[in-house]
């Protein structure tokens, strides 16, 4: 039996902020590592950021920075998020560490020496605009397998590993032009030559069922299609240089160097690193990955190890998970959909609550949709109503009626016979990396405790049979101690808080389970969690739905629309006539600062008399398309405020400006000093899309004031301070 557990989580790229789905692997590995330590197994948990390759280079181009600066930025972001989630790495390193180059190059040289490296001239996409060969992630197109839009390394939809040149309708991601095909030379790992050794190793793993069904299925399908030589070099600058003549200007493809990062990162903290990585007899290598990373860990990395012909520690257990998705939407920072690691921190919801929900719904066999309503329901019913409720009610009741001292008693045999079976099941689920099942088993144990407390009704028996009641509660207190141990891989902070109720008189160790050891007093007790309210959930659901971003986009569009397509001007009313065919229509002759003047028709006769308006300055939509009302031509439209009660008032310039000048343009305050366009004619619908409103007496578009162009006076709506502008 192997003595040590070497645990890795897939190295995250440093070109983004991890979202909730990205956290599944590091959290899963963390729970298993904590379980392993709880069982007294020597454990090493290794992870770090994957920093080389096209993903980093392209992101640096987008952010107008260097790859080094980009890596520093995102490594710090990842590290801070993982720390907030209380993930206990033994080391969280980087593939830019000082040992990585020599480790990668050494493995390559061994592969080359052993005849597993071949050289080929091939055709590769070349961008004539950017004058460079395009590595796989510099090209987008349609997957030849499923038709999904994808980058040139691997299809996110069908997980098919791609040959970039096979992409349909390819485009350069930098300039969006169609690249040409040009010849270049690259190095390949000869997978067909390693095939027999690789298949023999995989058959042994398959027989031991140490991988989940999906991992075995994907790997066997890849083998069945036939192994092909796979390129390991790229025409990039940001990467590990290739130590071979004529290839000095190329670097290793990131799939080749990234998994070797597990080894180089270990070297950073352990001098005797070979006792972990070259010790296949005594070390279990257990790797946690997403389903899109399966082939890199079951085919590619093992092929490198086997091809080097050294005694590397080989993958033993593979814990691959499906996708955690968000409210039937894609996680997208730009679209504002989905919750990311830095967003989680700002919700005010404790990290252990998030950990609980992710483990409770860990996508082990199928994709899972994160839903806010389900999040609230599970936390309030399972974590609070079940688990937290048992701890609070038992400890509070015991402390109130029986004091602080915990007596050492003979445990109830019938009760513990049932519970110990549940413990064995929980430990076995942990061992098989069925983390979701392990957590639900723990919650079942908690439910048993709650049922006994409820059925035995200690509040009724505390006076009539105090000793029996006390022993009942003491059995439940020892159960709570065990729950604090079993829950620790999932909720370490909560486990520590429960242990603090007892003065931390026991360790997180399986040796205490089912015993009457380790407890002497109840030093304190408090409610572990507060109920999550629907109001909070509704606000978070809206915030991360993308609708707020859509609103931001609409706001931006409204501002641009007004600046570029709408012209408002001040005019003076010279005369007013009534339309002989429609008494409610006023015909207004206007001085707009031009010799010709303007005429508009407006249905305001029910609101104003002629005497109230003649001589006043108002504001009109100056570039409205001419229209006829009852046969009378109208060359614009006056603007007015209307509130929710249908009160209506024209914007009168004299209300906010002395001696106004006809023809002065009304602009956005943010457009001050800019050269203004003379927009083309528009219809009324286009004007209404600008969504001008009165807020506290000031006319605004999305918080930006409308002002007079030259005098800079704010345009006011004095009589109706809040309403819409029509």
Swiss-Prot record:
It is found in: Cytoplasm. GO terms for biological process: methionyl-tRNA aminoacylation. Binds 1 zinc ion per subunit. Residues 562-667 form the tRNA-binding domain. Zn(2+) binds at residues 143, 146, 155, 158. Keywords: Aminoacyl-tRNA synthetase, ATP-binding, Cytoplasm, Ligase, Metal-binding, Nucleotide-binding, Protein biosynthesis, RNA-binding, tRNA-binding, Zinc. The keyword Nucleotide-binding applies. It comes from the Bacteria. It catalyses: tRNA(Met) + L-methionine + ATP = L-methionyl-tRNA(Met) + AMP + diphosphate. A motif ('HIGH' region) lies at residues 12-22. GO terms for molecular function: ATP binding; metal ion binding; methionine-tRNA ligase activity; tRNA binding. Its cofactor is Zn(2+). InterPro entries: aa-tRNA-synth_I_CS (IPR001412), Anticodon_Met (IPR041872), Met-tRNA-synth_bsu_C (IPR004495), Met-tRNA_ligase_1 (IPR023458), Met-tRNA_synth (IPR014758), Methionyl/Leucyl_tRNA_Synth (IPR015413), MetRS_core (IPR033911), MetRS_Zn (IPR029038). Its main location: cytoplasm. HAMAP family: Met_tRNA_synth_type1 (MF_00098). This is Methionine--tRNA ligase. It comes from Borrelia duttonii (strain Ly).
């Amino acid at each position: 039996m192997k003595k040590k557990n070497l645990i890795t989580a897939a190295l995250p790229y440093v070109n983004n902020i991890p979202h909730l789905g990205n956290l599944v692997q590091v959290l899963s590995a963390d729970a298993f590592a904590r379980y392993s330590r709880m069982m007294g197994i020597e454990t090493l948990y290794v992870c770090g950021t994957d920093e080389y390759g096209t993903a980093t280079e392209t992101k640096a181009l987008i952010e107008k920075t260097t790859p080094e600066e980009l890596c520093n930025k995102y490594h710090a972001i990842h590290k801070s998020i993982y720390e907030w989630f209380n993930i206990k790495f033994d080391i969280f390193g980087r593939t830019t560490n000082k040992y990585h180059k020599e480790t990668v190059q050494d493995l390559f040289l061994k592969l080359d020496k052993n005849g597993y490296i071949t050289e080929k001239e091939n055709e590769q996409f070349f961008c004539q605009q950017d004058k460079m060969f395009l590595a796989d992630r510099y090209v987008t197109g349609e997957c030849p397998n499923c038709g999904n839009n994808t980058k040139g390394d691997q299809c996110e939809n069908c997980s098919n590993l791609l040959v970039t040149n096979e992409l349909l309708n390819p485009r350069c991601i930098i300039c969006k032009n169609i690249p040409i095909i040009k010849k270049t030379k690259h190095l390949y790992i000869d997978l067909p030559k390693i095939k027999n050794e690789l298949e023999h190793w995989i058959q042994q793993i398959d027989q031991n069922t140490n991988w989940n069904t999906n991992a075995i299925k994907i790997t066997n399908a890849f083998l069945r299609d036939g192994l092909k030589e796979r390129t390991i070099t790229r025409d990039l600058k940001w990467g590990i240089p290739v130590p071979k003549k004529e290839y000095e200007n190329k670097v290793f493809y990131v799939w080749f160097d990234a998994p070797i990062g597990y080894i180089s990162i270990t070297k950073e903290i352990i001098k005797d690193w070979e006792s972990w990585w070259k010790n296949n007899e005594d070390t279990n290598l257990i790797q946690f990955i997403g389903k899109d990373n399966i082939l890199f860990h079951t085919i590619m990395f093992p092929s490198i190890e086997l091809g080097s012909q050294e005694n590397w520690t080989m993958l033993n257990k593979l814990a691959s998970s499906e996708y955690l998705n968000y409210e039937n939407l894609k996680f997208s920072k730009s679209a504002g959909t989905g919750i990311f690691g830095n967003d989680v921190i700002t919700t005010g919801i404790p990290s252990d609550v998030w950990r609980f929900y992710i483990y409770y719904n860990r996508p082990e066999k199928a994709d899972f949709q994160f839903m806010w309503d389900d999040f609230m329901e599970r936390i309030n019913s399972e974590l609070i109503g079940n688990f937290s409720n048992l701890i609070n009610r038992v400890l509070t009741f015991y402390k109130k009626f029986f004091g602080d001292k915990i007596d050492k008693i003979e445990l109830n045999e019938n009760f513990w016979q049932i519970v110990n079976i549940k413990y064995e099941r929980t430990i076995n689920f942990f061992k098989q990396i069925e983390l979701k099942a392990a957590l639900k088993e723990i919650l079942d144990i908690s439910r048993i405790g709650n049922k006994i407390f409820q059925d035995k009704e200690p509040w009724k028996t505390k006076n009539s049979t105090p000793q029996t009641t006390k022993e009942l509660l003491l059995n439940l207190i020892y159960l709570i101690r065990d729950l604090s141990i079993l829950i620790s891989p999932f909720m370490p902070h909560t486990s520590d808080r429960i242990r603090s109720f007892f003065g931390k008189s026991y360790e997180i160790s399986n040796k205490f389970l089912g015993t009457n050891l380790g407890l002497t007093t109840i030093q304190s007790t408090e409610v572990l969690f507060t109920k999550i309210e629907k109001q909070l959930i509704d606000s978070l659901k809206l915030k991360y739905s993308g609708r707020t971003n859509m609103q931001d986009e609409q706001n931006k569009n409204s501002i641009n629309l007004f600046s570029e397509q709408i012209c408002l001007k001040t005019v003076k009313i010279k005369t007013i006539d009534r339309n002989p065919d429609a008494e409610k229509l006023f015909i207004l002759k206007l001085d707009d600062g031009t010799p010709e003047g303007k005429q508009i028709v407006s249905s305001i006769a029910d609101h104003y008399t002629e005497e109230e308006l003649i001589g006043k300055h108002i504001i009109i939509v100056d570039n409205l398309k001419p229209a006829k009302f009852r046969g009378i031509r109208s060359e614009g439209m006056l603007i007015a405020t209307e509130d929710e009660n249908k009160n209506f008032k024209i914007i009168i310039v004299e209300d906010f400006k002395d001696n106004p000048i006809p023809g002065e343009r009304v602009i956005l305050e943010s457009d001050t000093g800019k050269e203004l366009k003379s927009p083309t004619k528009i219809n009324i619908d286009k004007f209404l899309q600008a969504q001008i409103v009165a807020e506290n007496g000031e006319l605004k578009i999305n918080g930006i004031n409308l002002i007079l162009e030259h005098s800079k006076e704010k345009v006011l709506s004095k009589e109706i301070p809040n309403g819409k502008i029509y």
